């Protein structure tokens, strides 16, 4: 496999987390296999989370961390995002990254609208992998919640701007997981990184 350009986004706002460890395992294996990496960690990113009232007509200027994230997103061929499932969705700060950074003219084109009324995506030709940690078992997420968070991420965020397909790896239940189980999860993340999958 030829080297790929990979963007990793750790979407857990804590300084230490399973999400961060999964990102590190993925990154280490990807680098060992010659893939190019750019990494962002929302616990280190500084920006105003409030989208504000300006809308797309008068958006807030992107802070340096968001501007760099968007530049790296445009550069990447493959996007890896790790995040915990909190109250059925991703953490607010991670959602704010997309609220603020995915702007018209860079992520989607409102001047070019489909017959369904949707703007043309501008980040096409990219794929994604989401490393989702949760205390809700994967079967429960699918049968009782209809994989709502997966649809939200893959269709309403990444797919909307052209990043597809998005594949998911779910690690659950995460809280108080035995050390041996965590090791298997980290190995799985490393296996994905080695293949840039």
Protein language model features and the residues they cover:
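N-terminal beta1-alpha1 ligand-phosphate binding loop
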Residues: 2-35
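Glycine-rich phosphate/pyrophosphate-binding loop and the adjoining helix
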Residues: 140-197
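Helix-loop-strand module that forms the ligand-binding subsite of alpha/beta enzymes
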Residues: 61-153
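A short beta-strand-loop structural module common to alpha/beta enzyme folds
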Residues: 35-46, 169-172
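Short, glycine/charged-enriched secondary-structure capping and boundary segments
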Residues: 21-24, 52-55, 94-97, 143-146, ...
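N-terminal beta-loop-helix "entrance" segment that forms/cooperates
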Residues: 42-61, 180-182
């Amino acid at each position: 496999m030829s080297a790929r350009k990979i963007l990793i986004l750790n979407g857990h706002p804590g300084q230490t987390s399973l999400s961060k460890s999964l990102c590190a395992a993925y990154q280490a294996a990807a680098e060992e296999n010659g893939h190019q990496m750019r990494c962002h960690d929302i616990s280190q990113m500084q920006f105003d989370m409030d989208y504000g009232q300006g809308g797309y007509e008068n958006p807030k200027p992107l802070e340096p961390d968001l501007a760099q994230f968007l530049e790296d997103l445009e550069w990447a061929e493959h996007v890896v995002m790790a995040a915990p499932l909190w109250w059925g969705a991703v953490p607010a700060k991670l959602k704010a990254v997309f609220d603020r950074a995915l702007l018209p003219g860079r992520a989607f084109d409102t001047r070019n609208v489909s017959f369904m009324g949707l703007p043309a995506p501008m980040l096409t030709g990219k794929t994604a992998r989401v490393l989702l940690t949760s205390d809700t078992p994967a079967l429960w997420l699918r049968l009782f919640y209809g994989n709502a968070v997966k649809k939200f991420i893959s269709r309403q965020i990444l797919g909307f701007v052209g990043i597809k397909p998005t594949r998911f790896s779910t690690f659950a239940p995460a809280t108080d997981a035995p050390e041996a189980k965590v090791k298997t999860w980290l190995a799985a993340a490393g296996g994905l990184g080695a293949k840039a999958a």
